[in-house]
Structures are given as structure tokens and as C-alpha cells.
Curated annotation (Swiss-Prot):
Keywords: Toxin-antitoxin system. It comes from the Archaea. Coiled coil: none annotated. The keyword Hydrolase does not apply. Belongs to the UPF0165 family. This is Putative antitoxin VapB5. The keyword Transferase does not apply. Possibly the antitoxin component of a type II toxin-antitoxin (TA) system. Its cognate toxin is VapC5 (Potential). It comes from Archaeoglobus fulgidus (strain ATCC 49558 / DSM 4304 / JCM 9628 / NBRC 100126 / VC-16).
Length: 64
């Protein structure tokens, strides 16, 4: 069953922000999903001068 675990990436290692119950050596799959604020900051200005409502519509359509 999938679990969502927030983590911080430091020095080449993903460090969970809460306790995880895995046996040592367990293999897991990590899906990277950037924070919305980071995504918006990265693409700030791409749309030119867009209305707030217009940007909210785009945000609703975006799937990461």
C-alpha cells in the first residue's frame, strides 16, 4: 500500500521528516514531487502578465 513520506534531500541522501517502519536494506520507490511554491517560483514570469484567475485555471490543469 502506498505511503506518502515527506523528506529533505541533503548531501545525496533523502532524510524522512517522520519515523518510518522499514527493515534495514528494504527497497522503496521514491516519486519526486516539487512543492507548489517552488514550481511557481521556477516558472514566474513565463506567462507574462497573467490574471490571478487565469493562473489558478492553469494550476488546476497541471498534473505532476
Amino acid at each position: 500500500m502506498p505511503k506518502i513520506i515527506e523528506a529533505i534531500y541533503e548531501n545525496g541522501v533523502f532524510k524522512p521528516l517522520q519515523k518510518v517502519n522499514f527493515r534495514p536494506g528494504s527497497k522503496v520507490r521514491i516519486v519526486i514531487q516539487e512543492d507548489k511554491k517552488e514550481i511557481l517560483r521556477k516558472y514566474k514570469g513565463v506567462f507574462g502578465k497573467a490574471e490571478v484567475e487565469e493562473l489558478r485555471e492553469y494550476e488546476g490543469e497541471v498534473m505532476l
